[in-house]
Each structure stands twice: as C-alpha cells, then as structure tokens.
UniProtKB/Swiss-Prot annotation:
Its EC number is 2.6.1.37. The modification N6-(pyridoxal phosphate)lysine is found at K194. Coiled coil: none annotated. It comes from the Bacteria. Belongs to the class-V pyridoxal-phosphate-dependent aminotransferase family. PhnW subfamily. NCBIfam families: PhnW-AepZ, PRK13479.1, transamin_PhnW. Gene3D superfamilies: Aspartate Aminotransferase, domain 1, Type I PLP-dependent aspartate aminotransferase-like (Major domain). This is 2-aminoethylphosphonate--pyruvate transaminase.
Length: 344
C-alpha cells in the first residue's frame, strides 16, 4: 500500500495525526466491555466539551456520515403535528429542508444568499406570523462557504417564541467554543471527522435530556431513531443497537485526548484562526479574494472567488495535488469559487 502524503486542505475528512491513524490497526469486538466503556467515556467527554451544565445534556452516537445524524434528529424530534423553520444559506441548510420534505414534515424556510448570514429580522417575522412552527434549525458554520451564522440570536429568538432549537454544528464543534446551555440549544449535531480531527464513520448528537425524552416513539426510521439509539446506549453501558464503527470510535477517542493535550477548544480555535488569517493575506497577495466578508468568516474553510480571466480550477487542483495539497471544489450556486480548509 502506498503511503498517502497528501495534506488535506478540506473541511473534513481532513489530515489526521499519525497517532490517530495508529489506533485503528487493532480490531475490537462491539460487545467487549472495554470497548463499551470507551463509548461511554466518549459520550461524557463530548458533553463536557459542549457545556458546563453537564447534568442537563447527554450524547447519542450514530453510525454513518454527519448527514445521518442530522436526519436522525429531524426525523425523531419533530412530532407528526410539528412544523420546522429552517434557516438556510447554503447546501447544508438546503439539505435539512430536503430531509423535512422527504419525511413529510411541514417546513418553512428563511433563505439568504450564500455569502450572507441568516437574517434575524426575517426569522422573527416568520415566527410571529406562523404560530404552528414548533422547531427551528440553523447551520452554525455553513461549510459551503465558510460563513458563520448568528446562532446566539437565532436560538434566543427560538426560545423567546417557545421553539425547540436545533443547531447543525458539523463544521464548528470542537473548533469554535460553544456552550449549548448558555445558547439554549436543545439539539446540537456534529461529526467525528471535523474539528475534533477524527476519521469518518459516525456523527453525534448532544441533546438536552428533557427534550430527548419527549422523542420516544416519534422516530420515522428504525436505524435513525434517535431516542431508541440513546436508550440502548444509556441502559446497556455504551452498546449500539447495530454494528458500530469500532476502529473509528477508537480513533475518535484518541483525537479527543489530543484535543485536550493541545489546550482544548480555545487553543484549537486560535490555531485555526491564525492559519485562516495567514491564508487570506497570502492569497490576497496573488489576487484571490474571499467570498465571505471578514465579519462573518469562520476559521474552518475559506471560499475564494475565481479570478475573472485565465483561471482553470482543475489545473490549480492538479498542480497543488502534485505538490502534496488537496483543496475543496466550490459548492456555491451563483458564484464560481473554490475552498481551502484550515482544520486538521
């Protein structure tokens, strides 16, 4: 097997440490007590990263990509008579809308341009006009562009109007400090292969216990039933209902230890932030402009606008890959861009 020397300048999967890779050499049994104890430690560590009020929250691990965990939340927490307001300004907000529609859940959309943050004024207007809305969902860092959405304001509004709050923090959790109790987030979703710097294979939901308990019997899918998954893990000491990605869990546990060793989320944020600023400055020197205004830019990934003349993305991609760097193609619908990630 050829050793991979590429540095992934992407928003996840990303470049992992040698020590994270090495723990995946060994095989583990899903029924083993030592393994299940590790699962419980992972669940507890995630809650402690998310809030100081740990007793109010719990973690559910879910096999698959981060999208599986998002769909588990959408399909499990909204009752048959519920309605969700989705704030969208990119591919991942739109994906939540698609999920709701596929699951035949009533959905209202607050949409802004991909380079603009969620419009709080419009969100409040929709909440005032539509009393049937029960839940509100927003993407924290929209990976499409690297824009940060105002989750503090969105969640505050949500609670002001008595709604359940859902935050897709796929590309921000572990890289940007968040206290979900302070922000009044009921369900936060992220993935193993993002800012905590593990490998792909499972996502996780950090849920307010009181709200999660209301989800019993509401799941619209067997394998993506969030409550049933939690209940099994809770009552059977970390057991998953179906085969779990044992190697990925071990890699994630190691990645959590390395996050702690680095100095925690604040230290990691500072590293990402400094790298992102350096990247934008150096790219600016050779004529590349970022899509998102600095005020709304996350340190996770930066979208750069194609120069108007003489630019071929595939040529840039191939040349960078030849030198050992892999970047991210653009996913913007109205503007030609490419992305460079700072995580990993």
């Amino acid at each position: 097997m050829t050793e991979n020397h590429y540095l992934l300048l992407t928003p996840g999967p990303l470049t992992t440490t040698k020590s994270v890779k090495e723990v995946m050499i060994y095989d583990w049994c899903t029924w083993d007590d030592e393994y299940n104890t590790m699962v419980q430690e992972v669940r507890a560590k995630l809650v402690s990263l998310a809030t100081k009020e740990e007793e109010k929250y719990t973690t559910v691990l879910m096999q698959g990509s981060g999208t599986f965990s998002v769909e588990a939340v959408i399909g499990s927490v909204i009752p048959a008579n519920g309605k969700i307001l989705v704030c969208t300004n990119g591919a991942y907000g739109k994906r939540i809308v698609q999920m709701a529609e596929m699951l035949q859940i009533d959905v209202v959309v607050s949409q802004t341009e991909e380079w603009e943050p969620t419009n709080i004024v419009e969100v409040e207007k929709l909440l005032q006009e539509d009393k049937e809305i029960t839940h509100i969902a927003v993407v924290h860092c929209e990976t499409t562009t690297g824009i940060i959405n105002p989750i503090v304001d969105v969640c505050k509004l949500g609670k002001q109007y008595g709604k359940v709050t859902i935050v897709d923090a796929m590309s921000s959790f572990g890289g940007i400090e968040i206290d979900i109790a302070d922000l009044q987030i009921d369900f936060l979703i992220s993935s193993a292969n993002k800012c905590i710097q593990g490998v792909p294979g499972f996502g996780f939901v950090i849920a307010k216990r009181d709200e999660l308990l209301k989800c019993k019997g509401q799941g619209r899918s067997l394998s993506l039933d969030l409550y049933d998954q939690w209940e099994t893990m809770e009552k059977q000491n970390g057991k998953w209902r179906f085969t779990s990605p044992t190697h990925v869990v071990h890699a994630f546990y190691q990645a959590l230890l390395e996050l702690q060793k680095e100095g925690g989320v604040r230290a990691r944020y500072n590293r990402y932030y400094n790298n992102q600023k350096l990247l934008v400055n150096r790219m600016g020197e050779i004529g590349f402009k970022p899509l998102v205004d600095e005020e709304y830019q996350a340190p996770i990934i930066t979208s750069f606008i194609y120069p108007k003349q003489g630019f071929e993305f595939q040529q840039l991609y191939n040349e960078l890959k030849r030198y050992g760097f892999v970047i991210y193609p653009g996913k913007i619908s109205k503007v030609d861009t490419f992305g460079i990630g700072n995580i990993g």
